[in-house]
Amino acid sequence: MLDDRAKLLLKALVERYIADGQPVGSRTLSQASGIDLSPATIRHVMADLEDLGLIASPHTSAGRRPTARGYRLFVDTMLTVQRDPLTAPELAPEQPQKVIANAAQLLSSLSQFVGVVIAPRRSSVFRHIEFLRLSERRFLVIIVSPEGDVQNRVIFTDIDYSQAQLIEASHFLNSHYTGLAMEQVRERLKSEVDMLRNEIAALMQAAVNVGSEALSDVQDEVVISGERNLLAVSDFSSDMDHLRRAFDLFEQKTQILRLLDISSQAQGVRIYIGGESQVVPFEELSVVSASYEVDGTMVGTLGVIGPTRMPYDRMIQIVDITSRLLSNALSHRK
């Protein structure tokens, strides 16, 4: 347990290191506002903080920098998030894929780090199906999921269906099967095909087949924006190994997906510092994440990935407001 003096010094050291990225010495801390301690006393307290694993001394400097453990204590017990107005443009209600891409770009532009959004899992349930004639015996099947995701598939048929038949098939599917999974629709169509006994039965079966394929892709899509922002971060630009590992992480996406999937199980903003998540074992990176909703149901996760030396108070604000903007845009999409 740290006493008030140690907490004050750790807070000042972390804030100073986040601000300029330079190891902080006792003389610098003695000049900090609110610290009325001699350099000798500060050195003694800093030695205690180092023994506790909260700060460390780079080999090239007499100053100290926070460790991941020090950042964690700072974030959990000393960080004050100012609720100052954060200027962020609204996310216009559009196609979900477009809104999600815009959210990732917004995260990266506001943070100047990397913005990440996990798109909602596609549902195998459909909300609406329509048919559009493209040419003779060539038709477009338009499938809308409950989340508003629109999938278009082209089918070729042996019969050149009329517009009236297309409308009839669409009406039958939407009135009888809306809200069911495509596999359920497929089975029910098989049992009812004898009853239907008309040309549109084959059309509906073809639509269900392509719809099942379109909506069965349950792989999470990770949208990443702003990777090049790390080139301007001294923590990475000065170390090619760190930079290479970071870009490998973004390219593979698997670890990011697992980490954000874990964070979706919690309410509010989550912070992962360095390798403490054990999913992304990268001491130089931190992740600030939050879930987002559609009509009150949690459907995905977003976040900012940047250096461990990041202004956590501002990142929390950015992630929180973007989560709310994305939830609003997806829920109010027409």
Curated annotation (Swiss-Prot):
GO molecular function: DNA binding
Stored Pfam families: HrcA, HrcA_DNA-bdg
UniProt keyword Metal-binding, yes or no: no
Keywords: Repressor, Stress response, Transcription, Transcription regulation
GO BP terms in the entry: negative regulation of DNA-templated transcription
InterPro entries: GAF-like_dom_sf (IPR029016), HrcA (IPR002571), HrcA_C (IPR021153), WH-like_DNA-bd_sf (IPR036388), WH_DNA-bd_sf (IPR036390), WHTH_HrcA_DNA-bd (IPR005104), WHTH_transcript_rep_HrcA_IDD (IPR023120)
Family: Belongs to the HrcA family.
Known role: Negative regulator of class I heat shock genes (grpE-dnaK-dnaJ and groELS operons). Prevents heat-shock induction of these operons.
PANTHER family in the record: HEAT-INDUCIBLE TRANSCRIPTION REPRESSOR HRCA
HAMAP family, per database record: HrcA (MF_00081)
Protein name: Heat-inducible transcription repressor HrcA
Organism the protein comes from: Verminephrobacter eiseniae (strain EF01-2)
